[in-house]
Each structure stands twice: as C-alpha cells, then as structure tokens.
Amino acid sequence: MKSKHMMIFPTILAMVFSAPSFSHSEHKAKADYDPIETEFGSYEPDLHASRTVEVRMNDNMRFSPEVIRVKQGEVLKLIHQNEGKLMHEFVLGTPESLAEHAEMMKKFPTMEHAEPYMAHVPPGEKMEMIWKFSNSGEFAFACLIPGHFDAGMK
C-alpha cells in the first residue's frame, strides 16, 4: 500500500509540470504548415519575403495600416503586433470569404484557426506569417473574433 502512494505523488507532479508544454500544441510553427493555394495567394514552407510589413491591432478594433498594397507574386513577411488587452486575429481572405467566416465564428466562437493565412495573436504578443500574393492591389484582412469584425476590424 505504501509503495502505491509513493508512486502517485511523483505521477501527479509529472502531470502538473508537463501540462504547460502541451498547452499551446494547437499552434503550428511556420514550417509545419502544408503548402496551400487560395484565390488570394499561396503558402509553401520555403518562401522568402521581399519585404516586411508590421500590422498593429488594438482594442479600438482597428488595424494599422488599414490597407496592404502588393504586387502580383510578391511575398510579404507580415508581423502582427497586438497592442491591446484582448485577443485579436489577422486573417487574409476576400471580402466575401471574410464576411462568411465572421458569420460562422458567431456560431462557433472557439473554432480553431490553423492555416498559414491566419494569425491568432494574444494580448501584447507578436506573430509572423509569410504569404505570396496572387494578384496586385489591395488585399482584404480582418479579425474574425466574434464582435470584432462587426465593430470595424476589417
């Protein structure tokens, strides 16, 4: 009996101290994404950015800059800085796909985002993405956390 109790305590300790290492297992590193092609661009692990754009987001439900202009085939490194106290997202898409996805998020607010064109950025944190844009012009992006899109974060 004594040996059973002696084994329970170390087991509980191991579980408690290993939990933090699993707490962010749903987040992929950039190199872990599979190649993908969409109507607004593509991702593959070996992309090299020709320029870097820092996108700041805040609790006033705004992005800065509000617009990103790109050339056809341009590869950008996007650095997302959450300057707020709330969780924010940066999701690339078309105006239609973003509006549709925002509606879906209202029904499924805990839906995971695990695509290379999506960044879930905790308060005070930075995240990066690299993306190859398919066409020149302005590209749509938004925060799809329920309420943020409707408050103007698009």
Region roles according to the model:
Residues 18-20:
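N-terminal signal peptide c-region/cleavage motif recognized by signal peptidases
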Residues 24-36, 62, 115-154:
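Extracellular/periplasmic metallocenter environments
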Residues 80-82:
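Asparagine-centered strand-capping/turn motif at beta-strand->loop junctions
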Residues 106-114:
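Short beta-strand and strand-turn-strand segments in soluble, beta-rich domains
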